[in-house]
Amino acid sequence: MMMRFIKIYRWLFFTACLMISCSSYDFSGVFSTLPAKPQAGEIVTLLYNPKGTVLEGSNQVSAIVRTYADRDLQPVSMFSMPNNVVDTEEYKMKRKQDGWLIEILVPDSVVGLVVTLHNETDTDYDEGLGYWVPLYTSEQHLFPGAEAGYAASLVRRGWGAKLDKTLYADTLLGFYNNEFSRNPAKKADFSFSYFSALKKSKGEDAYLEIEANLEALDNPDQWTEEQLFFLSAWYGAVKNQEKADYFKTKSREKFPSGRWVQREEAGGFYKKVGSTEKKEFLDEFEAKYPDHSGSSYMRGVIIGEYIKEGSYKQAFEYFKSLNDKLWSERPVFFAVNSVKDIENDELRPLLEIINKSVTVSRKEYEDPSIPKPPLKISSTWKETRATQLALALDAYGLVTNAMGNNTEALTYCKEAYQLTNKQHKQVNEHYAAILLKNGSKAAAKEILEESIISGIQTPDMEKILKEIFIGTQGSEEGFTSYYSDLKTKAFGDLKDKIESELVTQRAPSFTLTDTDGKEVSLSDYKGKIVILDFWATWCGPCKASFPAMKKARNKYEKEVKILFVNSKETAKDKLQAVKDLMEENNYPFHVLMDNKNAVFESYGISLLPTKVIIGKDGNIRHRSFGFRGETELLDELDAIISILNS
């Protein structure tokens, strides 16, 4: 209690000093702090002068502050990457004299801050590394872990695509080296992030150094399952497969029912076909591993399978049998999209399932039961919870609509539309379709037009808009021109966005073997636009994008070379797994086998799928991450190719 009183007294005293003696601030630099050497548990004032930055002339500036710890922190799942970020939050700054300021109470548990500043449209990342605010001890010494912690907070997701971790790897490595020269014991606290930076900076030249560090960390008397997984994963990353297999074997011997064994056995669930096979597998699996963390998703998949099969009563019976066991909603919502109109009570069991999701999601939205994720600001976290509730309401509205209750469905879909702030393509489409069913053609048309112009589109939006157009005009004459105008506006905005993201980085050369055994080099396509699509057979979003990529390949076959680079492949027979996927789906793709992940690493790929677009001059011009949908992918490629051809 006394310590709390002292802190409150310090805060009151500090505020009084500001009011009495700090009537002016020094904004001579772009970024500074008061005090110059801040401490944990104290108030720090961030001072920012945007003159000469992208934020010069802003009417409002906000700061995003990322606080970090003095070590890598392991998430609940040992399979997730460690992360030393304690919290991320956004603060609106106050205008003062020639600049902006904000006062922040620094938590006791952190050793530094990283700050970025932004207005409504632009962000000052300080060239990608953020503004660094290390914390100091009461003796005015740099806190142990402050330097390595700063680098680690950037290695872990950085500032999204704005931080090129390959470009800045040497800089980040310098912070680790400074830290370890001052505090050698800290190397063990930052093993994961340090190895990541070392590998990015030195490539294969770092392997021996990483192995030496791994040997120092290997203590059989203190083996935990987490440590064995860490050792195996990193030996694998530096291409020492013998050691990687050794520690994997030791883990299976020491923890025969451990999380690693469970995860591998759980993979068999996704090879089963249909609700019956999947349920039989999960029943046996849960009897063996009752506490497996991934079972909730598998339960959701089973409910979804019943729905896709039209077995709505069985879906409900299985749902009821779960009692208080958790089940994932995503596969259920996905399955609901396949529900056809049945104007009777056959679908009513689905309403009871989805209503449970609506109730839980609304409670989480209004009063979350879990802490805010450390890498999300409060407003973004609230948007995430709002989207979860919106998807539950959207699913409820879809089923209600399929049962013929169009007016009731409109209520749910309208709330979903409002919760997602018009930014979710599926919700927008469904709301417009149900408005149309309720006779509100003008409102449906306005929603679809606004969504398409904003680049938020599903393939079915064009069909619905065409139906409205014909119903209003009496024929489809003129629709093509009308729709083209909408797409032109969206395309212009998309091109502006992509042009602002263009880079010019020399593309690393490579030679790989394709599925026919022929050697293929990047230099074979000199003077041509090349798209490298990094993927793997286990990657769901990669495979989901392939129908769209087939359309892109057919459209640009003569002017653009698309190479599908199979990397991070886990199949025992990699080549056969790739060939089977191509043949089963009739994909005419030119696939290169990156069996040693050398190209994956030389291009600094961190997730799958990633598309790297290389210009005619041999430079990397753009990177596209993940898969958001067919329309978005094709529009993005159209825009990039148009820019590079101009």
List where the protein language model places each region.
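Alpha-helical repeat scaffolds
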Residues: 165-180, 204-219, 241-254, 275-289, ...
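Thiol-/selenol-based redox modules, centered on thioredoxin-like
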Residues: 613-646
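Structural microenvironment flanking redox-active thiols in thiol-disulfide oxidoreductases
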Residues: 544-585, 595-601
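N-proximal helix/coil linker or "cap" segments that precede and/or mark the start of modular domains
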Residues: 437, 445, 449-509, 523-525, ...
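Glycan-association/targeting regions that enable binding to alpha-glucans and other polysaccharides
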Residues: 22-215, 227-253, 276-287, 313
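Short, internal strand/loop/helix patches
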Residues: 511-513, 576-617
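A short beta-strand-turn-helix
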Residues: 510-530, 554-555
